[in-house]
UniProtKB/Swiss-Prot annotation:
Species this chain originates from: Tropheryma whipplei (strain Twist) (Whipple's bacillus)
Enzyme Commission number(s): 2.7.7.6
Top-rank taxon, per record: Bacteria
Family matches, as HAMAP family: RNApol_bact_RpoB
Gene name of the record: rpoB
Recorded catalytic activity of this chain's protein: RNA(n) + a ribonucleoside 5'-triphosphate = RNA(n+1) + diphosphate
Functional note: DNA-dependent RNA polymerase catalyzes the transcription of DNA into RNA using the four ribonucleoside triphosphates as substrates.
Identification of the protein by name: DNA-directed RNA polymerase subunit beta
Amino acid sequence: MSLFGVGFLASAKGKRVCAIGRSSLGKISDPLEVPNLLDLQLDSFDWLIGGPRWRVALDAYRKNPSGAPIAEKSGLDEVFDEISPIEDSAGNMQLNFSKPVLEAEELSVRECRVRGRTYSAPLYVEAEFMNHDTGEIKTQTVFMGDFPLMTDKGTFVINGTERVVVSQLVRSPGVYFERTPEKNSEKDLFSGRIIPARGAWLEFEVDRHDQLGVRVDRKRRQPVIFFLRAIGMTDDEIRDAFGEFESISVQHEKNIGLSRDDALREIYRRVRPGEQASAEAGRALLENFYFTSRRFDLARVGRYKVNRKLGVDVDPTRMVLTRSDIIATIRYLAALHLGFSEVAVLNSNKSVPISTDDIDHLGNRRIRPVGELVQNQLRAGLARMERVVRERMTTQDIEAIIPQTLINVMPIVAALKEFYGTSQLSQFMDQNNPLAGLTHKRRLSALGPGGLSRERAGVEVRDVNPSHYGRMCPIETPEGPNIGLIGSLACYSRVNSFGFIETPYRRVVNGKVTDDIEYMTATQEDEHAIAQASTPLRPDNSFVDERVLVRRKGGEVEVVPADQVDYMDVSGRQMVSVATSLIPFLEHNDANRALMGSNMQRQAVPLLVTESPLVGTGMERYVAIDAGDVLIAEDPGIVGDVSADVVTVKQDDGKHRDYHVGKFVRSNQGNCYNQRVVVRSGDRVEKGTVLADGPCTDKGELSLGRNLLVAFMPWEGYNFEDAIIISQNLVKDDTLSSIHIEEHEVSTRDTKLGSEEITRDLPNVSMDYIKDLDERGIIRIGAEVGPGDILVGKVTPKGETELSAEERLLRAIFNEKSMEVRDTSLKVPHGQQGTVIDVKLFDAVDGEDKLGAGINQRVVVYIAHKRKITEGDKLAGRHGNKGVISKILPVEDMPFMADGTPVDIILNPLGVPARMNFGQVLETHLGWISKQGWKIEGDPDWAKDIRVREAQPDSRVSSPVFDGISEGEITGLFSSVFPNRDGERAVGSDGKAILYDGRTGEPFPEPISVGYMYVLKLHHLVDDKIHARSTGPYSMITQQPLGGKAQFGGQRFGEMEVWALEAYGAAHALQELLTIKSDDVVGRVKVYDAIVKGYPIPTPGVPESFKVIVKEMQSLCINIEVVSDGEDDVSADAETLQIEEGLDTSPKVEVGSLEEV
């Protein structure tokens, strides 16, 4: 693993090599390869630490400066330069930092995962202490803490778990102008605000009386003339700059005698009311607010935005406000108020166009990627350290000071730890499958510190904006309260050094499309006419049509002559994200269902046997390889030794390289992460060749599900309302089986009464329970375990009980000091079972494993369980078509085709028209065609655009997004499918076949749509959800059972369920449910007693909730007395308390079944 976290991913991906030959049925040939899908994460972190990727980009920019300028300094250099120098209050001493360096990492990624450590490298920086009084300089290399590193998959390993830092979408610093309608009049109000990356806002606004005012640091409004005077403008300068604008000149004439000091005092009085105002205080206030780099920072992007919007020519490295910025902002706002279309730039012969800003436009929102987020956190940690350094400068002996004694690295370490461990943007990685992980790393979140909150975000900010085209996916977003606030980067987009998202276009010159690729931000794109990727072209790349459909600013569409087209999209999949681009026939689906399809692919569980889809989109290989779960050859060579966990390649340069294969590792979501070697000893491999498949990949392609033979038909009502019927074959053949691994952990600690101990010697436990424990008391690998079985024997010291005289005598004679212990063993939780596949023991004594304070040993046990498909599991297609399995039919009962082939799965045809996801039907048809193979005879009219004239049975095809095969072509291909041995084609040109009832052998009355659909098994498994309880915990307040599986709670019997039993008159069942099974405290204790002793169930008592009603009525001054037949007061609490006290010895154990009782 390389230090910079960009190992083989960076090098091996010149070209993604895939073993499956997938035939494309698209018409467009993409001129641009899909970029590395992890670049967003890898490039940003590489800039932070000054790695090789950033250096290469910087060198390239220096040779050919085009596009956004690349940062001249690395993120670490920037932040240490900002804080230097740290001076004491008298200015006699200063401390400078320079040359931050990351040394080699202590542990590899694999070791960090196993040992529960953080993958990091020590950060060193050169610190120089200078004493101005003596001229003495002391230099030292100082350790600044361990700096977490990014792995080559774009993740961080923090305390042994993989985490992802999500990029944040925030409002860019800059200057913004807006028009808001006035509620009580027909006039519009105009405002302009300068928003920095760090510091106070400066706002200007025109009120309903056409007067221009200013707000300093969002305080009270005051006339703009005061501010102009306060920044030192004379009467003549004000007349020259603003003479043409009445809203300012009127103010100026009124305050002609106003001095600068008076203006400063007035501003101070408005900003700090109640404090003593003086000209000097006002000058210091404005200086600190807007003209000091320590307090105000526009950032590179803010300066770029201000210069571009206002047309000013300020040095791009100047991060504070200048007088020309302020004058240009006021002139722009005054011109906007007067309705001008452009405004002249002062002291220059150019002018800038005037427009208000759409804050949701991606030209005004930027990405804060991982490098910048970590840099901001480091900056906060250094600021805390700076205060410590200043304090130590004043307290320590000047002669003895060296840099090391001044610096305390704890604030820096704490700041980074806090960010990676608890920040809203540092998230537990979604490792459900490779697509889930890849999408997580490409996610863009508007939430988090400095962003929006989901409660206050309106519809506008969540909505799709025309500027999202090619930058942010309009489809993929969550369905819940975060809809629109969390998005995903589009396939081809990239983030420039300012943080704006760019998307590529092909340049069009004189109506001819060239292969020159140009990346543009949303603001640059607004100035051009852009044609779509599917526009027909001649062989010489000129447009077929004289007039071409183009996009303009604001998403407006118009038809223009071909020679007026400036650019053209590079690909049909350019506007969508990776997950959405994996949906074939996306163009035939409703957007709501496409959203569900995108999200559900991320929930697909890795199956026991992977199979790539018959019908794909061509994106499968990019996803599988860029996600990093496929093992790839870094250099060409010959495969040497091959074993299950290591592949050795003898490279052409003579070196031997070992590739480690991951075997049965638990992912964050409890799935089985397993890699399978696909090469053999002696094979020739090139750079980028797949050596081993990962979970959900098949020969280097993403494979989330299985190709199943599907029939669209109702069957005895079992597939009513999205329910699904499947064949018993899928269970028997493990077609949809998956392996799940659970992790169970136990630690021994030092307690007040002594140390806990891992042992086989447990009190009051029979040999049957410990037969699978080894001599240490830890379960053996390979043991089959079920609920309640002991995994690790552990005893904890118990407090001494009062000893009898005899025991005291025996202890005195035999000097026996053994205290009593209680059994605190680790057991298998309810509802879990499986085979122990691994055990890890960490010992604090070794020194290698840092376990934390007070922990002596830690044992981790991994249990694997194979889950076959069963009723209640959730299946889905890629088109948002989802359902729950309602029945598993014997294969002999399933409908079958004329040749005897039974279908695998029966779907309800009514699930298609209302959902408007017809892509699933076209996928089914094309799936059948590619399974059978085809050969196009002659040159029929429908086949003129199909490049693949012949395909063998079981071949893989791709129908790219927005460039897919048409309905007419599918109909034609049905007639070209290879016939069976009888010379017949089972499925007609309409995609339908005669099916026969498996029970009777009779044909169904109508032909039925049959074909192959790619079906995913989702993570919503019934085994994780099903739950039952006999006894368990109760709520302290209501005395009713707790809710939820996690709390081992009961099932809620709600209002509607009560109505149902009332309707049937089931009085006794209802009484039992509302009393002894719920909150009749006395009754339930008696019932438990009766069950244990075998007595009849006693009659129920009074539930607690009834007593609450009585108290409620008494509080309303209605005296209620509840009496039984024997005139006894039933509602008294005395009896309840008495019985509860007497029966307090009742067992507190959770009983699993009546047999246990």
